[in-house]
A protein has these predicted regions:
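Predominantly soluble domains enriched in secretory-pathway, periplasmic, or organellar proteins
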Residues: 12, 16-382
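Sec-dependent signal peptide recognition
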Residues: 4-9
């Protein structure tokens, strides 16, 4: 009987605490702090960012900000959303607990790209003019700025966040910036002569973080890079017009979408041999994997179909038809769901990765969405 009374007291305390928390806003449905659940898509027509509930397949909130957003990133530990303001060389920081703007960052440079650091506390802005600016979101202060790169839009952090890799296409090299030393510490040549017309992708990491992959798009090859010794260890010929590679989360394969010949090259990470080239029949803009890396979704640069590739049998399945061209895709951290926006209409599509079917399609309330992001995803290589 005493134990029953104790249990009842604990339940009563829990319920009263929950009620008090609700009053204080600690359990408010307005919170958008679950980094694996909520995705964020910047409107390209309104001063807002759309929060998407990936679990329920619906719009969770419309976050109003003082400007039309450029790119966005969300942090998990700090529960913050950062939206760039390229026209004013600035960025806005929003608290996801209450959706209030808590800081406006004067960057002193145009933020053409934005990406989070692995530590979750820092955010990096890059410009086509070759400047990188790193900010501490816990203090809303700039940590340091590095200038003088050819371009600073093709950026990737190392697995632990201690290094920033900046691809410089014309020079066909990667500049390595050390976060602790706040300076460039190395340059990694990608092979070949400098070329003002060269097209090169950003670097992608293997799942373990030891190996990097860069597509030299204009030369139909990828460079395989030792990210410990900072050197190219192999150059592999792939299809025509390869874009940014993608490493599967199980570290078995590297996937290279070939834009110009509409195919997907599959490379085994252990042998670095091409194991398959699968027709996609679309001009690719990126690739994502889902359902425990058994399926790849190739997102289109144009057109209204997503290519579906079976990674167990290395063959194409029926494509997924959408009502318009899709944005980039994000895959939830449980690998079950692909989320994308329809660029021209502002609709959001939720795709079940197991069945390969659209499970939900809903209006976001804004005319155009592009650049969907989530704090915690199935993507381990970017």
């Amino acid at each position: 009987m005493a134990m029953k009374r104790a249990l009842l007291v604990l339940v009563a305390i829990s319920l009263s605490s929950a009620a008090a928390g609700d009053i204080l806003g600690l359990f408010s449905s307005d919170k958008l702090t679950d980094g694996s659940r909520y995705a964020f898509a910047p409107s390209k027509s309104d001063r807002s960012v759309i929060a998407i509930d990936t679990a329920d397949g619906e719009i969770a909130a419309v976050i109003e900000i003082p400007h039309v957003p450029g790119g966005v990133v969300a942090t998990n530990e700090l529960s913050l959303l950062v939206a760039t303001d390229p026209e004013n060389n600035a960025a806005t920081v929003v608290n996801l607990y209450n959706r209030e703007v808590i800081a406006q960052l004067d960057l002193g440079m145009r933020p053409d790209v934005v990406l989070p650091n692995a530590y979750d506390r820092f955010v990096t802005f890059g410009s086509t003019d070759g400047s990188v600016s790193i900010w501490d979101l816990s203090t809303s202060q700039q940590v340091f700025r590095y200038d003088g790169l050819e371009s600073a839009t093709l950026l990737t952090y190392s697995f632990d966040g201690g290094l920033l890799f900046a691809v410089e296409p014309t020079q066909k090299q990667i500049s390595v910036i050390d976060m602790a030393r706040k300076e460039k510490v190395a340059e990694i040549p990608l092979g070949g002569e400098a070329d003002p017309n060269a097209e090169v992708s950003a670097l992608s990491r293997s799942a373990d973080g030891y190996t990097g992959y860069v597509s030299i798009t204009s030369e139909n090859r990828i460079a395989v890079i030792d990210l410990v010794d900072w050197k190219v260890i192999q150059s592999l010929s792939v299809g025509k017009g390869p874009i940014r590679p993608f490493s599967t989360t199980d570290n078995r394969y590297v996937l290279v979408p070939n834009r110009d010949d509409q195919s997907l090259t599959v490379i085994a990470t252990t042998t670095r041999n091409v194991v398959a080239t699968v027709p996609t029949n679309i001009e690719a803009r990126e690739v994502n994997t889902a359902w425990l890396d058994t399926v790849a979704f190739v997102m289109p640069a144009q057109g209204d179909e997503i290519a579906v590739i079976d990674l167990q049998k290395f063959r194409a399945e029926s494509p997924i038809k959408l009502p318009g061209r899709s944005d980039d895709g994000i895959v939830t951290s449980d690998s079950k769901t692909l989320i994308t926006a329809i660029v021209e209409t502002g609709e959001v599509a939720v795709i079940d990765a197991q069945s390969r079917n659209v499970s939900a399609l809903f209006d976001s309330g804004t005319a155009s969405l592009e650049g969907i992001e989530i704090a915690l995803s199935n993507n381990v290589c970017h």
